[in-house]
Regions:
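Extended polysaccharide-engagement surfaces of secreted carbohydrate-active enzymes
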Residues: 1-171
Length: 171
C-alpha cells in the first residue's frame, strides 16, 4: 500500500495458452503511483469476430496474431527481424532472487524466438527497491539481426541524448 513503491513484474509462459498473447518476456512497471510500462490488454472478442477475425486459431500463421494487441510488437518485450514470437515456444523462471536489496528474475526466452536468434535471455531486477534494470543478453544467428526493444507507456517521451529518453507523466 506504499504509493511511493516501485513495482515490476515479468511475464513468462507461452503464446499458445488459452486467451494468450505474444507477450513472453514482457514487463509491467509502476513507480511512485505512476504506471510507466503497461499492457494494453486485449481487444473485445465480439468486435473482432463480427469482422471475420479467426480468433480461436492459435497456430503460428493465424489471423489472431495480426491483431496488434495480441502480438509481440504491442508488448514490453523483444522482436527480431519484425517476426512474431513462436507460438510453440515456452519460457519459464530460470533464476531469481528475493533478497531485499536485489530482487530479480531471469528467463531464457530463446524458445519463443526459435530460428530468429541463437539465444535470448532477459533479467528484470528491482535494485534497492528504488529502480528497475531490464537486461537482455542476445546472441544472433545471422550477421545482421534487427532487434526491436519495445516499451508501451502512457507517458510522453523526449529524446535527450543518444540512446537516452526521458519519460514524463503526472508531473
Amino acid at each position: 500500500n506504499d504509493s511511493s513503491a516501485v513495482y515490476v513484474g515479468m511475464k513468462m509462459g507461452s503464446p499458445s495458452v488459452n486467451h494468450g498473447h505474444m507477450d513472453v518476456g514482457s514487463f509491467l512497471l509502476e513507480a511512485d503511483g505512476v504506471l510507466w510500462g503497461m499492457d494494453m490488454g486485449g481487444e473485445e472478442y465480439n468486435r473482432l469476430e463480427t469482422r471475420g477475425v479467426e480468433l480461436w486459431n492459435s497456430r503460428q500463421n493465424s489471423q489472431r496474431w495480426d491483431v496488434y494487441r495480441y502480438n509481440n510488437f504491442a508488448h514490453n518485450t523483444l522482436s527480431f527481424n519484425h517476426k512474431y514470437q513462436d507460438v510453440k515456444g515456452k519460457a519459464q523462471i530460470d533464476g531469481y532472487s528475493d533478497q531485499e536489496n536485489n530482487m530479480y528474475v531471469i528467463s531464457d526466452l530463446t524458445p519463443v524466438y526459435k530460428d530468429q536468434v541463437k539465444s535470448a535471455k532477459r533479467a528484470v531486477s528491482l535494485v534497492d527497491k528504488e529502480y528497475v534494470v531490464v537486461e537482455d543478453v542476445i546472441e544472433a544467428t545471422k550477421r545482421f539481426t534487427m532487434m526491436t526493444w519495445t516499451m508501451v507507456t502512457p507517458a510522453s517521451a523526449k529524446i535527450v541524448a543518444d540512446n537516452v529518453m526521458l519519460l514524463e507523466k503526472d508531473g
